[in-house]
Amino acid sequence: MALRDNAIVGYAETKIVLRSEVDVWELGAEILDGILEQTGFEKGEIDGLILSSSSTGAGNIFWSQTTADQLALELDFCQTVDIGGSSPVGAVARAAAAIDAG
């Protein structure tokens, strides 16, 4: 399979609020619920997670693994992308490569 054979089938985002009272894990759950609703996938079908580091979890070198644990995801692949402003694009490229690798 070529990298161009992979597709983004859904996305979700949270409302951007300055100094939100919502916990970072609640935001993660909101994103997960939105993606599951949009795609029709079941939570158990998710086998990989790639996140960019956040200001909230920047000090946690296991940010993506901690997030997966908090969301009760059982994964085969989990990674944090921390390459500055290009982290979102880097995350998409790594996800495509991970899917391509099986």
Predicted features, each with a name:
Residues M1-T80, D100-A101:
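Conserved "HGTGT" condensation-loop signature of ketosynthase/thiolase-family condensing enzymes
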Residues I83-G102:
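Active-site-proximal alpha-helical scaffold in enzymes
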